[in-house]
């Protein structure tokens, strides 16, 4: 288990980022007529449109088919919004994402591969859509009881399910965000993996701007509020407006969430959450309908640290080494000066003694 200081430092880094970047900016509701294609440029002002044209032109040199497919018009706009339409910052953020995706190839992760054990547990999965047509990513922390699974694989499993959610977006209809539902029933300290959760937030900040449309936390326990108190003061109003806490009520001995039905149709809501959907996640059934991609070589082992965090740590380490070298240099210079001073003092003393001897000889 991580120390409190480590957790606090990680939370501070994340919340600092969240205060600088809004990953969940409010967008107006999308209303399309039948057969109408969503136009992402329709509501841009002149300055925003110029920024869009500039960043799109800057990426016109892309040759990798995967990069080209990733960089849609709506993708460019997500990264622009994440950096307040400052093209240089948006471009850097997007290029960092492309580099990360090229290195780790999240689209090639195989659920039946090295994440099968954690993937079978049902800690995270994708199922159905909310009332706005957004894919729903469910998280069930109580299912995370696998102590022998390293954080790297837990993080990789989360990235897999995020990619599954992204693949279900429908950009022609303006759908580019997901709905995140976390069921905290029976959640305990043994299910808390703060490291993976914090790194997941780093990942969302660095590589998934504007993707989270709504977060619904069901029956949050006392342990959750401990973590929330650390993070929430740093979140801006727009981000907080996308988060909602919903407590259940027992009806005929079953949990029900009346407020949850504001977001999800009862037909798309699982029975254990008060809906009509008879569904229990099963990895084999899921893979039948969503087979793993066929790849020559599997993606390399994930690190739970995103590139930006690594760069910060490396920079901090370099600065520390530099300060250490400067300190050693100053110490050496100080020792050299001290030695030089003692040498001068010695020479002066010897010169004085010699003079005294000469004076004594003259007297004799």
Swiss-Prot record:
Tagged with keyword Transport: yes
Span of domain CRAL-TRIO: 113-281
UniProt entry tagged with the keyword Repeat: no
Positions of the UniProt region annotated as Disordered: 290-364
PROSITE patterns xref list: CRAL_TRIO
Disulfide bonds: none
Bias (Basic and acidic residues): 316-352
Function as written in the Swiss-Prot or TrEMBL entry: Has phosphatidylinositol transfer activity.
Protein name, entry field: Phosphatidylinositol transfer protein 3
Organism: Dictyostelium discoideum
